[in-house]
From Swiss-Prot:
Belongs to the ArgR family. It comes from Pectobacterium carotovorum subsp. carotovorum (strain PC1). GO terms for molecular function: arginine binding; DNA binding; DNA-binding transcription factor activity. The lineage of its organism: Bacteria, Pseudomonadati, Pseudomonadota, Gammaproteobacteria, Enterobacterales. Keywords: Amino-acid biosynthesis, Arginine biosynthesis, Cytoplasm, DNA-binding, Repressor, Transcription, Transcription regulation. Disulfide bonds: none annotated. Gene3D superfamilies: 3.30.1360.40, Winged helix-like DNA-binding domain superfamily/Winged helix DNA-binding domain. The gene is argR. This is Arginine repressor.
Amino acid sequence: MRNSTKQEDLVKAFKALLKEEKFSSQSEIVQALQDEGFENINQSKVSRMLTKFGAVRTRNAKMEMVYCLPAELGVPTTSSPLKNLVLDVDYNDAVIVIHTSPGAAQLIARLLDSLGKSEGILGTIAGDDTIFTTPARGFSVKQLYEAILVLFEQEL
């Protein structure tokens, strides 16, 4: 049990350091973690952590190349601000079309797919900012359309 707490502390410290956006090399991250009391940390472990958490090198405000973490997406839920990414929902006789903020369609489609057939969703196809979804057997297009409006708290 003590080991997992130590690991959690390491992950928390690692993420906090990367949020500072001032480390341009893995050795700088190793040194900073060692300064925080993680004596057993090495470059190889930092490299694995950078990969695991999807860290990327980008330019900070001072135009220096630094490591940083992408915005955390996690598993989407309907109570999260994802509903703010849905701009418009419409339908015809065959499909429901959902327009999202640029880049958000695949995330919203993932949420819809996770609800599955029991909620009336046969499947989704997502581009960058548009999603097509079709109802499962036993559900009408209009029923699914109304369920999606409720899900994302859109106006009926």
